[in-house]
Amino acid sequence: MKTKYSYYNNQLTLIHQGKIVFLKGFIFRKRNLGKTLFFDLRDVSGIVQLLVKENNPQYDKIALIKLETVVQIKGQVIERINKNPDLPTGDIEILVSHIEILSEAQTLPLNVFQSQESLEETRLKYRYLDLRNPEVKHFLIQRHHITQSIRQTLLKNDFLELETPILSKSTPEGARDYLVPSRIYPGNFYALPQSPQLFKQLYMIAGFERYFQVARCFRDEDLRSDRQPEFSQIDIETSFLNQDEIMSLTEEIIVDLFANIWKKPLLQPFLRLTYQQAFELYGSDKPDLRNPLKITDFTTFFDTNTYSQNIFAGKIKGFKVSKTAFLTRRKLDEYQLFFSKHFNLKLFSFVKKNDKIIGGISQFIQDDSFLKNEEICFVVSGKKDIIHKALGIFRTKLALDLSLVDTTQEALLWIVDFPLFETIQEDLSPPNRLYSLHHPFTAPRDATILKSNPQKALANAYDLVWNGYEVGGGSLRINNHQTQELIFSLLGFLQEEVQNRFGFLIEALKYGTPPHGGIALGLDRLVMLFTKTNNIKDVIAFPKTQSAKDLMLEAPSAVNQEQLNTLKLQLKCNFN
């Protein structure tokens, strides 16, 4: 609580001119003009300029103050001669009469004012200094505002903010678990939750009906620019709402965010595509619709006779673009290498000039009306699933190379009607073994085909995609034990394994379970998108490196033998 003479920096304006104020903060920048000293004082609200004149009895002492020293100052608000329109306090400055050093800073390992220019390793090791940079701090302040907006939307819809345990049980959710050994039960382990999935379903069984929390989740998986081993999600579960109602609620959350964070309107309802449509049009289940390229079927324009069947092994699909001048021979060779190396596919390209098709397969084109002059066409042929996946990746690359993405727009859409199961052919497990595309608690759209044709089953699942990022995923859940046990059986779980790992859930489903479903929104990704950064580490206070290390804490680290003995653990290998 501030005293009546104290202010945050950004509260001060010309209406305070002549007032004596007390301010506290960090010395951010300083300039010595001989008979006058100028300092920038930074607090959590912003920056204000301090003026120290030569007649100040502390002048010599103040001149020696190092950057990032924490001070308290007393001074008078005066009008600034050279105003700074880029600062909220740019019309005023503080004529300092007294300064007290609260904590002196040593020589800094990085320049706080320009910390983004330091090596990432240095920034992460001294993250508490990096976070002093106002631009870096802005990411976390926005994170707060985003979280608060979501919370307010849910509270006005009668949701309860409830917690779930961190020490949990290992369950299959698609990634490796972080395990915590038990001292009391030697040889047994807790698992850090990959999500609060089962607990939030138990809340519904307990009759709470509307739950949410800002949940911490942990997944031991390979990292990338938008993924960390621990992350936050807005976890939501409801009873008695159908899929459309949950999606509508989620849209309300996002619309409120656009209004509160960007002061922009957002139209509802969002576009919806089925999983099949998304792959056939864009080659991805999380397409960036700011990219105008769509996969087109050109098969009917080709003469697929016996001879050409040696070249075309199925449907002929691809893209056509008009920016031919930007595509060099080297770039075309790079594209061909991509398809051959990663997908064992042959990429064909041809261009239309002066009403004539030029390219290696022009003799097979029986109708060139699909192509305009100066347009280039890229096509591949093969099995549908393979060419869609390949073209989806190529679509992103081609749009990036040709600057086709309209970055002034925001593209949100739903992907629905996912398959309930998938098969992973590369796996060493038995062929055609089924795996849950989302998780094994997702309700099927039609449970009657589970026994006869489970591969054709669709899921009551929905993903929210924003500019090519999956920012949310949810589903309706199974609410009877018979269907849940059948799903486990189809996934290859033995009865004993089901009982050991999910017996509590099967038991709970027997005592009256409301129809329920929910969604989890990736908070880190949402903040990343709202702050227009490409690196998720920017929006996390203390992130890990790409190799899952905390450089500041030097974690993970070895523990001493006494700790291992207490847990009755013995290391199999010495990795030091």
From Swiss-Prot:
Residues that hold L-aspartate according to the record: 173, 219, 438, 477
InterPro entries recorded: Aa-tRNA-synt_II, aa-tRNA-synth_II, aa-tRNA-synth_II/BPL/LPL, Asp-tRNA-ligase_1, Asp-tRNA-ligase_1_N, Asp/Asn-tRNA-synth_IIb, AspRS_core, GAD-like_sf
Function: Catalyzes the attachment of L-aspartate to tRNA(Asp) in a two-step reaction: L-aspartate is first activated by ATP to form Asp-AMP and then transferred to the acceptor end of tRNA(Asp).
GO aspect biological process, one term: aspartyl-tRNA aminoacylation
UniProt subcellular location: Cytoplasm
Region of interest (Aspartate), residue spans: 197-200
Quaternary organization: Homodimer.
Protein name: Aspartate--tRNA ligase
GO terms under cellular component: cytoplasm
Keyword Repressor: no
Keywords: Aminoacyl-tRNA synthetase, ATP-binding, Cytoplasm, Ligase, Nucleotide-binding, Protein biosynthesis
Family matches, as NCBIfam families: aspS_bact, PRK00476.1
Reactions it catalyzes: tRNA(Asp) + L-aspartate + ATP = L-aspartyl-tRNA(Asp) + AMP + diphosphate
Main subcellular location: cytoplasm
Native source species: Aster yellows witches'-broom phytoplasma (strain AYWB)
SUPFAM superfamilies: Class II aaRS and biotin synthetases, GAD domain-like, Nucleic acid-binding proteins
Pfam families the UniProt entry points to: tRNA-synt_2, tRNA_anti-codon
Residues annotated as binding ATP: 219-221, 228, 470, 522-525
PROSITE patterns, per database record: AA_TRNA_LIGASE_II
EC number: 6.1.1.12
Family membership: Belongs to the class-II aminoacyl-tRNA synthetase family. Type 1 subfamily.
GO molecular function: aspartate-tRNA ligase activity; ATP binding; nucleic acid binding
Protein's gene: aspS
